[in-house]
């Protein structure tokens, strides 16, 4: 087998988002768009979390939704997208020129996600598809994702079970005098991974990803960070306001603050002790 053929190989353990789930989400999107923006013609989804919600895969590209159809355009990786997503229409793209050539015409108003879209991305889209104005649909997308299906709730329950086991049952046994903040955080994170956590927490913020979370001892938990949350940490250093210090050791009588994220197949639970 040549090295190029490895691009389409994926583990047998892959669990795809059911096609029926994707179809329901797309139908709800069109229904809400017609309510809020009657006569809409085209929406372009670029944010990877929203792309995953509607397609079941996270790639570099764009999901174009119209009243009559939806196409996932993928620059990289097309093979992976075809393997992961059950969406029927997935096509390769080189740039937005590919979309412009395919659609030929475009509406005066384009519906996009303004919260995560960069000016550079909007300019590139407009270069090849010169619409007159764009309208933000972040609020609409958030309102759709707020209402969880039974499929989504089941994944959150699985995440919560991992959270409960690790933070309530294992953490008390792992907290011992002399352990560092960083060591405790990494150890708890590792236990979550062993039990099926997907290993990252995503939040609807400009810098919205955290991997390991935070373990803080004593007054370290009062050190404010840029993250909009109740806890704090000195971090590993000034440049990384997360995880905890590898040099701050637990002493007898100090309070322990833990905020270690957990999630399963894209769905999170939040637990702090």
Regions found by a protein language model. Give the residues of each.
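Short, basic, glycine/proline-bearing loop/turn elements
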Residues: 9-19, 82-88, 230-234
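Short, compositionally biased
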Residues: 269-273
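Acidic/histidine-enriched ion/cofactor-binding microenvironments in catalytic or ligand-binding pockets
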Residues: 66, 104-105, 214-266
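Short, polar loop motifs at secondary-structure junctions
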Residues: 48-49, 57, 74-80, 115-122
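Flexible, acidic/His-enriched mid-domain "rim/lid" segments that flank
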Residues: 2-10, 101-223, 250
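Terminal domain-start leader segments
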Residues: 1-71, 107, 150, 168, ...
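Short acidic-hydrophobic, aromatic-tinged amphipathic segments that line or gate anion-handling sites
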Residues: 87-99, 135
């Amino acid at each position: 087998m040549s090295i190029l053929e490895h691009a389409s190989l994926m583990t047998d353990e892959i669990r795809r988002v059911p096609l029926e789930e994707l179809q329901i989400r797309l139908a709800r999107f069109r229904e809400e768009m017609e309510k809020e923006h009657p006569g809409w013609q085209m929406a372009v989804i670029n944010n990877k979390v929203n792309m995953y919600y509607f397609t079941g895969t996270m790639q570099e590209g764009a999901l174009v939704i119209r009243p009559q159809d939806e196409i996932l355009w993928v620059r990289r990786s097309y093979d992976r997208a075809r393997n992961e997503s059950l969406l029927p229409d997935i096509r390769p793209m080189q740039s937005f020129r590919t979309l412009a050539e395919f659609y030929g015409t475009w509406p005066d108003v384009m519906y996009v996600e303004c919260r995560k879209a960069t000016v550079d991305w909007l300019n590139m889209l407009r270069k090849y598809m010169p619409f007159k104005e764009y309208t933000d649909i972040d609020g609409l997308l958030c309102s759709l994702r707020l209402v969880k299906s039974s499929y989504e709730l089941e994944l959150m329950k699985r995440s919560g079970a991992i959270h409960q086991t690790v933070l309530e049952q294992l953490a008390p046994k792992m907290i011992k005098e002399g352990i560092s903040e960083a060591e405790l955080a990494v150890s708890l994170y590792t236990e979550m991974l062993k039990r099926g956590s997907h290993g990252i927490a995503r939040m609807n913020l400009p810098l919205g990803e955290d991997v390991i979370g935070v373990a803080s001892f004593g007054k370290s938990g009062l050190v404010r960070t840029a993250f909009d949350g109740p806890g704090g940490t000195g971090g590993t250093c000034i440049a990384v306001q997360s995880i905890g210090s590898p040099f701050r050791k637990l002493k007898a009588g100090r309070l322990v603050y833990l905020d270690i994220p957990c999630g399963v197949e894209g769905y999170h639970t939040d637990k702090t002790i």
